[in-house]
Amino acid sequence: MHFIYETKTLYSELFIGKRWLEIGSGNCFPKAKSHSKDCEWIGVDIEKGNGVDVVSLGHLYKNNQPFDAVCAFEVFEHDPYFDLTVTNMIEHLKPGGLFMMTCAYLGRKEHGTSRSHPVAMPFTQEMDRWKDFYRNRTPGDFRSIPMFKELINGYWVINEMSKDLYYRGWKR
């Protein structure tokens, strides 16, 4: 993903020897992890899989040590607890740490539900609350989360071609 590569180019120090948390780490998209070196990387997802270290819902994951960076790629449109997941990610972030995400934006076709293409999100099909949940996200969805105000110097990108929303910001 160009956004991840751009972030690494601008903030290369975060991709060497740092501690990362990735929510939704088992999905099939390219990861920031592949751009990192000697980082401690904890991948969290709702089912066992490649890149998954901890099986947990994103909003329920707990760890006593803060992270230098937290990320989620193409996850929030599938998460009915999206606001709680974002809050939890920010709570796990060190002051000055990076919050980075991508998700589906307005106009993106529904995917990963029993109505659309269940094979695209196999984990969610076994979870009643999740299997038919889908919502494209906007910057306003994130800004409405009280904890999101803890992030500063935010940078939003809307990719009109893929209908994706990208964001990176720093915890106060």
Spans of model-derived segments:
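Class I SAM-dependent methyltransferase Rossmann-like catalytic core
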Residues: 1-15
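Sparse, context-dependent recognition of short Cys/His-centered cofactor- or disulfide-binding micro-motifs
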Residues: 5-8, 26, 41, 127, ...
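N-terminal start-of-chain detector that recognizes signal peptides
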Residues: 11-16, 26-29, 129, 136-143
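Residue-level marker of regulatory loop/turn positions in helix-turn-helix DNA-binding domains and
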Residues: 12, 64, 158
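Conserved SAM-binding loop
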Residues: 15-109, 167
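S-adenosyl-L-methionine-dependent methyltransferase catalytic module, highlighting the catalytic core
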Residues: 80-90, 94-172
